[in-house]
């Protein structure tokens, strides 16, 4: 069986065939850099990191491009709040993004263009759309004429005529009144007083969000790419609009495969900054959740399915990782005792191509692993293979840790070295690598005062009921500083985890 991927565009799980044999071009929508990344971002970028690692492992040459949106209303708002420039906010959060992704073992993209660095390509693309009649300008703004693009809605399945009927009777604001159609969207926004702006044929202003990605895809990878990635929340309007812009300009298909990951849910709601129910990657790591525990937690669910963030789920992942980590570290810690050659870690960003073992059993296990990931990146199935592979290795590690000398003689008969080498190889495809012994947790977290936490949770609940969200956020931040992370659940309940 070859790799099969669920294509949002066709709504089918299809065999993957790249445009150019042996080469794969991938574009992934990046973050708007106004704040720290939360667990939802980790879910997305870990899923796509595994896709990239797997393709490389299977022998493909992969070009992976991921953008930064470094000019946006949210960035401007945050800059005003902090009384600093848009550039300062962007630079701070780009650096924080790299730190978070590096901590999680996510390979850095081959190229990471920024919107402000691609303005020539953006202006050129808008000009082409206007010249073809697919866009129109109004007093310094430029809009895409949705009704001129007959394929609009093919990704999301939305019927514009039906939605227009449902929208009839709405009171239009000033911008809506300027549009030819309510679903038309901005390609270029005229300058506003006090905001950064850039020159253009339509006057000073800045690009719309959607046009940025279309321009960067074309500039970095060409007019048609193999795979376009993003979260399910981007299907409409962002990715729908990307398709409309790009295909109206080039007359060619933008991407052959569209993959979308499911959301992280907290208390039955999508984790998001707008809802205030998010937990940053940094907070989780600082509070003692290991990077590999987070990877395992995320990969135990299929990338397209919703992922529920609960204390129980994190604790279960931590337990699972403890055993897997013991097996992965076996050959490094006990290489001399077992007379095994030391397994040196691969350089950052290096993925070895798959290589068959001289053991038939190992080759069967490798094939089970391949079968799982070939099935639309079934990471939970691949992890199950790792746990089966690790079982005797974990048992050996535990015996050696207890000083059981008989284990060495028995191991020689079992010939576990190829099994361990295979475990390290396959785990690397999922970005799972043995961690060094964890440092002791800060003293503040050694004793958890549960009564104090419950009182704080009760006070926070009262504050939220009174719509005093500032106080509720303050309580959450104070507990976070003490190493306690709150997790809101359905029914107004709140769980917590501690490092």
Curated annotation (Swiss-Prot):
This is Cysteine--tRNA ligase. SMART domains: DALR_2. It is found in: Cytoplasm. Binds 1 zinc ion per subunit. Belongs to the class-I aminoacyl-tRNA synthetase family. Zn(2+) binds at residues 29, 213, 238, 242. Keywords: Aminoacyl-tRNA synthetase, ATP-binding, Cytoplasm, Ligase, Metal-binding, Nucleotide-binding, Protein biosynthesis, Zinc. It is an enzyme of class 6 (ligase). Monomer. InterPro entries: Cys-tRNA-ligase, Cys-tRNA-synt_Ia_DALR, Cys-tRNA/MSH_ligase, Rossmann-like_a/b/a_fold, tRNA-synt_1_cat_dom, tRNAsynth_Ia_anticodon-bd. CDD domains: CysRS_core (cd00672). Disulfide bonds: none annotated. One of its GO terms (molecular function) is cysteine-tRNA ligase activity. Its EC number is 6.1.1.16. GO terms for cellular component: cytosol. A motif ('KMSKS' region) lies at residues 270-274. It catalyses: tRNA(Cys) + L-cysteine + ATP = L-cysteinyl-tRNA(Cys) + AMP + diphosphate. GO terms for biological process: cysteinyl-tRNA aminoacylation. SUPFAM superfamilies: Anticodon-binding domain of a subclass of class I aminoacyl-tRNA synthetases (SSF47323), Nucleotidylyl transferase (SSF52374). ATP binds at residue 273. A motif ('HIGH' region) lies at residues 31-41. Its cofactor is Zn(2+).
């Amino acid at each position: 069986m070859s790799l099969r991927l669920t294509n949002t565009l066709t709504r089918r799980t299809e065999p993957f065939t790249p445009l150019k044999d042996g080469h794969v071009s991938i574009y992934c929508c990046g973050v708007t850099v106004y704040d720290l990344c939360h667990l939802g971002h980790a879910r997305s970028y870990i899923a796509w990191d595994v896709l990239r690692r797997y393709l490389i492992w299977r022998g493909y040459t992969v070009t992976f491009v991921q953008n930064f949106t470094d000019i946006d209303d949210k960035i401007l708002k945050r800059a005003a709040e902090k009384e600093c420039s848009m550039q300062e906010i962007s630079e701070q959060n780009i650096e924080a993004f790299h730190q978070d992704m590096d901590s999680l073992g996510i390979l850095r993209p081959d190229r990471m263009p920024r919107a402000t660095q691609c303005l020539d390509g953006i202006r050129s693309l808008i000009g082409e759309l206007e010249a073809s009649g697919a866009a129109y300008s109004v007093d310094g703004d430029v809009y895409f004429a949705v009704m001129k693009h007959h394929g609009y809605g093919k990704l999301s399945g939305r019927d514009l005529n039906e939605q227009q009927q449902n929208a009839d009777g709405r009171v239009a604001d000033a911008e809506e009144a300027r549009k030819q159609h309510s679903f038309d969207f901005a390609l270029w926004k005229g300058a506003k007083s006090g905001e950064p702006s850039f020159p253009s044929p339509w006057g000073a202003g800045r690009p719309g969000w959607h046009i940025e990605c279309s321009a960067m895809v074309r500039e970095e990878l060409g007019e048609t790419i193999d795979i376009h990635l993003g979260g399910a929340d981007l299907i409409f309007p962002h990715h729908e609009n990307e398709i409309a812009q790009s295909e109206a300009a080039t007359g060619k298909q933008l991407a052959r495969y569209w993959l979308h990951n499911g959301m992280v849910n907290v208390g039955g709601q999508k984790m998001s900054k707008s809802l205030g129910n998010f937990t940053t990657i940094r907070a989780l790591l600082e509070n003692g959740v290991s990077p590999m525990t987070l990877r395992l937690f995320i990969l135990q669910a299929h990338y397209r399915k919703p992922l529920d963030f609960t204390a129980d789920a994190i604790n279960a992942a931590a337990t699972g990782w403890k055993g897997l980590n013991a097996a992965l570290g076996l050959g490094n810690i006990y290489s001399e005792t077992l007379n095994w050659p030391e397994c040196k870690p691969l350089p950052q960003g290096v993925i070895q191509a798959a290589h068959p073992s001289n053991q038939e059993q190992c080759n069967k296990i490798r094939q089970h692993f391949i079968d799982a990931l070939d099935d639309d990146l079934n990471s939970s199935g691949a992890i199950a293979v790792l746990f089966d592979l690790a079982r005797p290795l974990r048992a050996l590690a535990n015996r050696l840790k207890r000083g059981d000398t008989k284990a060495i003689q028995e191991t020689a008969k079992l010939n576990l070295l190829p099994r361990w080498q295979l475990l390290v190889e396959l785990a690397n495809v999922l970005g799972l690598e043995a961690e060094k012994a964890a440092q002791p947790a800060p003293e503040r977290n050694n004793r958890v005062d549960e009564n104090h936490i419950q009182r704080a949770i009760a006070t926070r609940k009262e504050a939220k009921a009174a719509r005093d969200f500032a106080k509720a956020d303050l309580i959450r931040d104070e507990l976070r500083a003490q190493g306690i992370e709150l997790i809101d659940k359905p029914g107004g309940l709140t769980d917590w985890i501690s490092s």
